Amino acid sequence: MLSSYPNWIIALGIVFVVAWLIQLTLQLTVWMRMMRQARRQAQQPAADSSFQPGVSVLVYSHNEAEALARNLPVLLSQNYPDYEVIVLDDCSVDETQDVLKMMEQRSDRFFCSRIDDRTRAMSHRKLGVLLGAKASHHDILLMTHAECMPSSPDWISGMVQHFANPNVEVVLGPVVYERRVSFLSRFCQFDLFNRLLLLLGTTLAVRPYAGWGQNLAFRKSTFYANRSQGFQRHLKLQPGEDDLFVADVARQDNVAVECRPDSLVTDQSKPLFISWSLERLSRGFTSRLYAMTPAVVRVTDSVTRYLTVLPGLALVAYTLYNIINVEGVHQTDWTVMGIALSLLLVRTGLLVYTHYASARALRQRPQLLWPVMLDLYMPLVDVWFRCKALMRRRRFEVGRVGLL
């Protein structure tokens, strides 16, 4: 009988069951939401060819000559009739200018704009977006980076088709890191994919709160209407040209999520770990400015992970100790241990399935062991970068350099 158990074990069991139910709810409603969206969109007909508004692709670049030479031909060969590509060159000192001149000669839809190195009153990335918006000839702006490659020639079509709905002002697209074999690279790949599931899942299930500038589309009219040219509220901060902009303009009814694999963008940043660390640190700083409701979802998910796994393992250990060391009939111990193990296995299986099915929905190679191995570690990574960003918050001000 349960009455034979100490009160602290009973309390631990109650905490375990409640936390497990919360985790189950979050897995089904948030973490699996992107996968269901991708499957639903895959079954929908192709983009309506009658809706093909002009699009301006804004490509931010800083000393990325090699990446531009590799990725610009892909951007300039999209299956879309009316678009232009504008490279925003942030004071590059490598062979970027040579690459840009060559591309200007090859394509009449290619343009470039150089960010003045003397600018100190505004983040160069935000200034680049502002210059790109002013230089663009179309109302639909599609942001990406020089080191990012679209997965297909239909990338623009997939991202832009959502603007057929006049209420849609922002479209969020999926981003993954290029697959590499080293341990650190795979860790970075898993972390970004994990955050992608949470970001898009929370956007679909709760409310939008951020986005990635590697794959982000929005209306130019929305950009200019947002607090005087898009960045007024956080003008003095270096980061925020993508996530804080989305946080400012996004509502539940004006944001669409594109999850088709043809709309995927692969980030080929090198060295990957440094790029990942800088991006993580930047998000650790800007996340404090996100909306409250998504933050509650994120914290609840992190806390209930520990309140599920640790009490569950404690119950298994306690009942196993009783079976081995205490004389008598242990039917209750076996029952409690079986229930605890079953619930833990169900959660683990659901965790692995979510990552596996989501990766397959985006035509990515699944990482089956990483969700289990890093289940309790990833919230600590998040806390680490948030604390580090808080301690170095002055470095995120305009005019400061060096984030790490």
Residue ranges and their predicted role:
Residues 1-48, 382:
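N-terminal membrane-anchoring/stem segments of glycan-assembly enzymes
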Residues 33-36, 305-395:
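Membrane-embedded multi-pass helical conduit in multi-pass membrane proteins
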Residues 42, 64-77:
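Short, well-formed alpha-helical segments that are part of the catalytic scaffolds
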Residues 111-124, 128, 158-233, 284, ...:
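Long helical/loop segments within the catalytic core of UDP-sugar-dependent glycosyltransferases
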Residues 141:
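Short aromatic/hydrophobic "clamp" motif used to bind/position activated sugar donors
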Residues 163-195, 224, 228-298:
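Catalytic donor/gating beta->alpha subdomain of glycosyltransferases that bind UDP-sugars
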